[in-house]
């Protein structure tokens, strides 16, 4: 099992993701190598896919959008995202998707 979810000492999570923009619908699509694949309905134009990714993850993780930040991969399909949260069990819930 790939460890695409990394938990820091402060409780925040770093997610390793592979993004497929321009998909029919937004959602998790299983593991893609060492990363979780997420399909986004938003096109990869003017940062729309990045904004949609942050909004999707904020909704899934039940945190404000401001708690989700793109760490790397602004113009790439391979991205690392940080989720600042204190929600117990969130890392396990995310790992269960893959």
Swiss-Prot record:
Gene3D superfamilies xrefs: YggU-like
Lineage top rank: taxon: Bacteria
One Gene Ontology term, aspect cellular component: cytoplasm
SUPFAM superfamilies according to UniProt: YggU-like (SSF69786)
SMART domains: DUF167 (SM01152)
Pfam families reported in the protein's UniProt record: DUF167 (PF02594)
InterPro entries attached to this UniProt entry: DUF167, YggU-like_sf
Family membership noted in the UniProt record: Belongs to the UPF0235 family.
Protein name (Swiss-Prot/TrEMBL): UPF0235 protein azo3464
């Amino acid at each position: 099992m790939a460890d695409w979810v990394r938990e820091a000492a402060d409780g925040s999570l770093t997610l390793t993701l592979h993004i497929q923009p321009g998909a029919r619908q937004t959602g998790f699509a299983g593991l893609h190598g060492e990363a979780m694949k997420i399909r986004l309905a938003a096109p990869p134009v003017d940062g729309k896919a990045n904004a949609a990714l942050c909004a999707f993850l904020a909704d899934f993780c039940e945190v404000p959008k401001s708690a989700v930040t793109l760490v790397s991969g602004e113009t790439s399909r391979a991205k690392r995202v940080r989720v600042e949260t204190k929600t117990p069990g969130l890392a396990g819930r995310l790992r269960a998707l893959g």
